[in-house]
């Protein structure tokens, strides 16, 4: 398992991910119409997280979903965080393209 390249980090930042804790964690807030859409989004994330065996920390505040990613056992960011972040962004674009 390797870390995220500087190019990968730059891509994530350009997509709205915040780099936290000196590059050990990434975080992004996703906004929806209502609570149901927030919950549905989390359900959409679950299969991808399971497929990668890499699960985000998530907080839901009615119509907002805050996702944080880090690889706890590596003490920072890895390619798993990058892959899941990119997938989450794709899912969000698909979910919100009809709003």
Curated annotation (Swiss-Prot):
Reaction(s) catalysed (UniProt annotation): (4aS,6R)-4a-hydroxy-L-erythro-5,6,7,8-tetrahydrobiopterin = (6R)-L-erythro-6,7-dihydrobiopterin + H2O
Enzyme Commission code: 4.2.1.96
GO biological process, one term: tetrahydrobiopterin biosynthetic process
Enzyme class name: lyase
Keyword presence, Lyase: yes
Molecular function via GO: 4-alpha-hydroxytetrahydrobiopterin dehydratase activity
Keyword line: Lyase
InterPro entries from the UniProt entry: PCD_sf (IPR036428), Pterin_deHydtase (IPR001533)
Pfam families: Pterin_4a
Family: Belongs to the pterin-4-alpha-carbinolamine dehydratase family.
PANTHER family in UniProt: PTERIN-4-ALPHA-CARBINOLAMINE DEHYDRATASE (PTHR12599:SF0)
Name of the protein in its database record: Putative pterin-4-alpha-carbinolamine dehydratase
